[in-house]
Structures are given as C-alpha cells and as structure tokens.
Amino acid sequence: MFVPEEIIETIKMIEYQNLDIRTTTLGINLKDCADKDLDLLKENIYDKITSLGGNLVETANKVSQKYGIPIVNKRISVTPIGLIMGSTVKGLSDEEAVDACVEVGITLDKIAKEVGVDFIGGYSALVQKRATYEEKMLIRSIPKLMTKTDKVCASVNVATTKAGINMYAVKKMGEIVKETSEITKDAIGCAKIVVFCNAPEDNPFMAGAFHGPGEGDAVINAGVSGPGVVRAVVEQLKGKDIGTVSDEIKKTAFKITRMGELVGKEVANELGVNFGIVDLSLAPTPAIGDSIANILEAVGLERCGTHGTTAALAMLNDAVKKGGAMASSNVGGLSGAFIPVSEDAGMIEAVEVGALRLEKLEAMTCVCSVGLDMIAVPGKTPASTLSAIMADEMAIGMINKKTTAVRIIPVPGKDVGDYVEYGGLLGTAPIMPVSEFSSEELIERGGRIPAPIQSLTN
C-alpha cells in the first residue's frame, strides 16, 4: 500500500531527479529449442521468443503509462547459446560451426528488431573451468557476429569462486575483443561484449544479461536506477556524519526498490509469466546529475578518484543493498553501483582532470558492481594486455566471492587524450592510458588459476 505522500514523492523523483525503471528484461528458456538441424533450431528459437516476448514492449509501455513511471529499456535475455549448439555443430568443420553460431545470432537480431526490444542478451558461453567444442566455436564467432548484428549482446563467464580462472579463456577473450575492435566502427562491437567472473543468472542489464540454466521457462527481471535521487538526498546532508548519510541512502533505496518491484510484477502479470528479481544497481546515464561520481563527490570528495573514493563507494553500495533488501524479498541480479566511465558524466570529468585512472577504477571494483565497464583504451593496446586487465578483474571477483566483469574497448586510431562518441546510454568515452609494460608471458602460459580456499564452503 502506497500512501499519498509516497506517491507525490515518487512523482518529484521522476520529474526532477531522473528516476526511472532502467529496464524490464524478459528471460526466456531456449533449452527445448535445441535441434541437430540448424534451420529447425532457428525456427524453434524464433517461435519461442516471439510467442513469449512479442508483447513485451507494448505491455511495458502500458504499465509505464498506468503508473507514470518511465521504463527506459525493454530487453530480452535467453539461455546461453553455447548450451544449445552442441547437436547442431556436431560433425561440422570449425568454419561451418562458427557460421552456424553466427546464423543463430542473426536470428536473435532479427527477432529483437521485429518485437522492438532495445537489446537481446544470451549469445553467451559459461567456460569458467573448461570449454566444450560448441562453446569454443561460439566464442570464435563473436567478432563476425558483431559485424552482422545490431542488437545482440555477447558474454563469456571465464571465472568463478568455485572453479577458479580459466586462463585459456581469458587469453582468447583478449584476442576476441581486439579482433572485434578492428572490424567494427569505432570498436562499437566491444561495447556489446562482457567478460565475467561469477556471472549471475538473473541479471537484467546489458550487455551481460542471459537467462541462466537454473531459471524457469520465462521470467521478468527489473532493473531500477536512481543515482539522481540518491545524489539529491546526499546533497541535503552537508555536515552530517557518514552514518547518517548511509541511513538516508538506505531509506531512499527502499523507496526506489518498492517502485521497481511494483512495476516489474505488473509487467510480469500482464505477460502471464513469473516475476523474477528487482536489481538494485544504481546505473548512471550521461545526463547531468545522473551520475555515481557525483554522489561520491556530494559525500565529500573534490573529485571522484581521489583518496577516499573506494571507502565512499563501499558505503554507498552497502547502503543501497541494505535498503533494497528491506523493501523486497526478490532482490537479485547484480545489485550494486555501476561505474561505467563513458555512461557517467561525472566519471568522464574525473578522467579529464586526471583524478580517475584505470588503477583506481580497479580498486573501486572491489566494493561495487560490476567491474571495469565501458573503458576505452588506445587502439594500439595488445591483446595480451587486454587479457591481463581481464585476469586482474576476474581475480578480484573470485577472491571476493562477487560478480565482476570487464567491458573494455580498444579504439583503433585513438590514443590517450582522444574521445570516442557512441551516443545514447553508451555516451562518450575518453581514451584512458594503460601500462605499456608487457604481460604477454603470463597470458601465454594458459592453464587455470586454481579456486581459492574460500571455495571450500561445503
């Protein structure tokens, strides 16, 4: 039950502080679509997704209008394609298997455009320990896929706390990202590729969303975003102690989460599917004031990236989770604070003045979601360095038993001081410096970094 005061407060949040439902994501199980015949596989996928998701956009718009709450994105996530390609590629040559994977990806892109969603996720492989033949071929196909599709997002889980880090997969993903950067305009394909440690099965956010093997047949997951609301609250607390700031953020997260769950459940009910989770992640946009960096600066930092940034971010992340957990029993996904550089106006400014560097971002990922996100680096950066950056981030996730990820973009022809413009939610990325010292020998070793002792929890 919402009292009139809460409704008025929510209206103000929407009107003045950029509060919105960032996404309603329909997860769809495709395991029953598997077939040894490629044409039948594609037909099964088409029929399944369009039958369950054909009304997603219309329904989300209807619910948005009913409550007066913007739903910015409507998305679909599917069972990791690497799990359903086995019988289809059996007996094919490597080249034929890669092409078969790409054809499935093109089918997903066609469906996404037909039903009107913003993105479709799940062109994915779960290879934290080892990779099957079909998963190897799917990973190999990612660069080619990115030249032929617009709305398909790819993700590869290369590490978990239980399994350790698959360094063969880390090495390969550095090469895949490098190749993709060289064959897509301004390396835009890399913005749709995520490398994960401990990937959640119910994440509604792109580019890393997929419908996990442990999920049901169809489910709605909602992602709420309110950096502008949190910033406005913190700015009213000048001179207050940090515990008070934390308490007020918790209260705000509680309100935001209730709204997200209400809308998510309504969309699920209208579609006749289960409601899954509400993701508590504070996801920024390039809009002024809708920035995680600005929240941290309102807490008391001259610039995001200076000393104290990691501590302030830890407090913010914890407060958001505590407030959300009190509001709902259906919390999941990533649920933290995103720090994507290109998508956050405050982060961009911090990079420009030299307050924020890649090393500090890596430290910040120890306490937040989701990792090194939308980081643009010089196009000359070698694949081995990209892999090493991924390995560092995977280690943080593995040891800390949390989700971490890397979405890094080596932009051809660009160097430190340059920018690449993507527009929309992807924003503008300043090219950040990386170490020029080589990590190639480490990456060439391959193998698997063993799981830490924390994995023995049974």
UniProtKB/Swiss-Prot annotation:
The record ties this protein, via InterPro entries, to: UPF0210
Q: Which Pfam families match?
A: DUF711 (PF05167)
Q: Give the top-rank taxon of the lineage listed in the UniProt record for this protein.
A: Archaea
Its family remark reads: Belongs to the UPF0210 family.
Protein name stated in the entry: UPF0210 protein MMP1427
* Lineage of producing organism: Archaea, Methanobacteriati, Methanobacteriota, Methanomada group, Methanococci
